[in-house]
Regions:
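Inward-facing hydrophobic residues that define packing positions of alpha-helical scaffold repeats
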Residues: 49, 115-118, 190, 197, ...
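Conserved, well-structured interaction surfaces
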Residues: 85-157, 184-187, 204, 366-372, ...
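Bacterial Sec-dependent N-terminal signal peptides
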Residues: 1-30
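Short coil/linker segments at helix-helix boundaries
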Residues: 156-192
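TPR-repeat structural position
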Residues: 190, 248, 393-394
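Hydrophobic-face positions in mid-chain alpha helices that act as interaction patches
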Residues: 47, 228-229, 250-377, 409-410, ...
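Short, surface-exposed recognition loops and adjoining beta-strand edges that mediate ligand/DNA contacts
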Residues: 36, 66-79, 159-166, 210-300, ...
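Membrane-proximal, proline-rich intrinsically disordered regions
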Residues: 21-71, 411, 450-482
Length: 482
């Protein structure tokens, strides 16, 4: 088989149409180019990256399944209440159900396919056919992205690092081929992730001092860096990784590298939340993706207004949300801007409207609003808050309050959160208040080993590996992992 370079057309491939990885690799899809042609110029590399980002943004991955779809359903944030729906089985953690296994398979396969596309870029960067100072920067972007993609997998398919670092991790893929990937322990997987991130940090050190979207829609690859895996996305991902490992000093260090870069990042004012509730989240977006279809897919999923059927997906009950967003203690008297911006009453249930409140709004959205957020600034304050508490509770509370105050709330005091247990419980609530629809709540619940309410608020789900560790797809052994 002639090797092919993955071009933008790959973003149009349907995972459901790919019966096996081997067949996929034996076919040259329409719209691909031979390697020697594809990677004969910088533009060829740029196009390959656009193909990677376009594939990530599809509903099969970050456009839905990895964000407001399957992963947020695991956190009980959303779901259909129809007894026959996959959603009900997902939220019951029935990982042996065929329809749930199909979700897991599609997530796993889709993520590794994107990783293989990144690996193809990296393989060609090892022996380029021309010289350019940009080639090393492209390598940094690709390495950082490979680490980011693996980290999202290990958070779902392996034990939490602090509770099971010597247990089975995931395959870490270094090749375009989807077969014969070495399986590492959790600790070994994290070592590979950090190795890629360290090199990405080194290679991107001289660029990305301004991270923005450049809403003029410039075609320059080196503008609009907020929709590329930029240097500050590397810092933010390292903060996430070190947080997961329990390395508080490093987690705080890298989160602070982001929050200190006020030239690009600043929390919205307490009266300006509307400007950051969705993409492009100006001033708060660290890494996101353009997507022409995201808002339409969102409207189709959340705005059909039919509760109790497969036609509509509802959020937590009003009583659960009122409890989550309740303002108590020293903060009493203020209003959390997020609840009304994210949810509304529809008959007997709550509708999630964070990214669009109607199908018409989704359709009419400007090009600059057509995208999704993957890493945002508030999370960097949450990471600092957790990391600093043991050594400096006052600084930890200040970090937490910066986000709260930007969302319209008054500051909490130490008397509101007198113990570390209380503080961490409040942090979990903040993830749930701030990040619905982004796929970050389930990993946070796992990290904090926290109990949580089911979708309708009828029962409390206790943390366990049987919930937090997804099973590998049944077909995975056929791909030759070792």
């Amino acid at each position: 088989m002639k090797k092919t370079a993955l071009y933008i057309a790959f973003g149009a491939l349907s995972l459901a149409a790919l019966p096996s990885c081997n067949k996929f690799l034996d076919v040259q899809p329409k719209g691909t180019l031979l390697q020697e042609v594809q990677f004969s110029s910088l533009q060829g590399y740029y196009d390959a990256f656009y193909g990677v980002y376009g594939t990530m943004a599809k509903s099969d991955l970050y456009g839905q399944r990895m964000t407001n779809g399957f992963v947020d359903e695991l956190a009980q944030m959303f779901g259909s209440t129809s007894a026959t729906s996959t959603s009900v089985k997902t939220r019951a953690y029935n990982y042996t159900d065929v329809s749930v296994q199909a979700e897991i398979y599609s997530l796993w396969l889709g993520q590794y396919q994107v990783i293989s596309y990144v690996n193809n870029i990296l393989a060609n960067l090892e022996s380029p056919s021309f010289s350019s100072s940009h080639l090393s920067q492209l390598k940094g972007e690709a390495l950082g992205l490979r680490a980011f993609l693996h980290f999202d997998l290990v958070r779902l398919f392996a034990e939490d690092y602090q509770r099971g670092k010597d247990s089975r991790g995931i395959p870490y893929s270094y090749d375009f081929n989807l077969k014969n990937r070495t399986v590492y322990t959790v600790a070994g997987t994290y070592e590979n992730i950090l190795k890629d991130l360290d090199e990405a940090e080194r290679l991107l050190s001289d660029i990305d001092e301004t991270v923005s979207l450049d809403l003029s829609q410039s075609t320059d690859f080196w503008s609009r860096r907020a929709v590329h895996f930029n240097k500050y996305a590397v810092y933010a991902t390292k903060a996430r990784v070190y947080q997961a490992m329990g390395n508080s000093a490093k987690a705080a260090e890298y989160a602070k590298k982001v929050t200190d870069h006020t030239a690009s990042f600043k929390l919205a004012g307490r009266n300006s939340f509307e400007s950051v509730r969705r993409f492009p989240a100006t001033g708060e977006l660290i890494f996101g993706l353009y997507s022409n279809s995201f808002l339409d897919d969102f409207a189709n999923r959340f705005l059909k207004n039919v509760a109790g059927t497969d036609e509509g997906v509802q959020a937590h009950s009003r009583s659960v949300l009122d409890q989550l967003y309740a303002v108590t203690g020293a903060a009493a008297g203020a209003i959390d801007n997020r609840q009304a911006a994210f949810y509304r009453n529809v008959d007997a249930y709550q509708q999630f409207i964070r990214f669009a409140s109607s199908s018409e709004e989704a359709t009419a959205a400007a090009t600059a609003q057509r995208g999704l957020t993957l890493i945002r600034l508030p999370e960097m304050y949450y990471i600092q808050a957790e990391a600093l508490y043991s050594s400096d509770p006052t600084a930890a509370l200040a970090a937490l309050n910066k986000v709260r105050e930007s969302r319209g709330l008054n500051a909490l005091t130490s008397s509101d959160l007198p113990t570390q247990v209380d503080f961490k419980a409040e942090l979990v609530k903040e993830y749930m208040r701030e990040m619905p629809g982004e796929g970050q709540i389930f990993p946070a619940l796992k990290h904090f080993n926290s109990s949580f309410l089911d979708l309708l608020g009828n029962s409390t789900i206790q943390p366990s590996s049987s919930i937090f560790v997804l099973p590998w797809p049944q077909d995975e052994l056929t791909y030759g992992n070792k």
